[in-house]
Amino acid sequence: MKLAIIPVTPFQQNCSLVICPATNRAAFVDPGGEVDRLFEVLQKRGATLEKVLVTHGHIDHCGGVAEVAERAGVPIEGPHPDESFWIDQLDHQGQMFGVPGARRFTPDRWLHGGDEVTVGDMRFEVRHCPGHTPGHVIFASTQFGVAFVGDVLFQGSIGST
């Protein structure tokens, strides 16, 4: 697996660009904003975006989801349906927290615990992890020993992913 971590927005939330080395297909996980910058990284990596994966509906994790999906013509997968409240509030969250361009979206696929998502030939198990938000999900791969956890776990702090 190839991976790029891209801190975005004033929150410095980590958006992940996950690339399958076998197919060169990619997904953004939690594109919170700074969409032009995200596409620059994608272009530099020479990968083809196939989808957007979303862990939860807070502005710093999904403020750029609608724009990324529209610009690339790719589907949105996740989060869990219990996040619809937060996603419906994205326009307001963007105004409150100064994230321009943030707007609501409708996932092409809502996710549930036990579902599977793919990026190229790579497979990730979806785990529903309510707590930070009701519909928070994570994407875990035992094959690669990695999990994209959104705001379920923090390394060395209580708020910087």
Each language-model region and where it sits:
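Residue-level signal for pocket-adjacent positions within structured domains
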Residues: M1, D82, T106, H112, ...
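Conserved beta-strand hairpin/beta-sheet module of binuclear metal-dependent hydrolase folds
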Residues: M1-R45, I138-G150, Q155
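Metallo-beta-lactamase
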Residues: H92-Q93, E116, M122-T161
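Short Gly/Pro-enriched turn/cap motifs at secondary-structure boundaries
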Residues: I6-V8, V99-P100, T106-D108, H128-P130
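Divalent metal-coordination and catalytic microenvironments
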Residues: V18, D30, H56, V68, ...
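Active-site HxH/HxHxD metal-binding segment of metal-dependent hydrolases
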Residues: T23-A26, E34-M122
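Short, basic and Ser/Thr-rich N-terminal targeting/leader segments
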Residues: F11-Q12, R104, G120, T133
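Generic preference for hydrophobic
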Residues: L3-I5, V29, V52, I76, ...
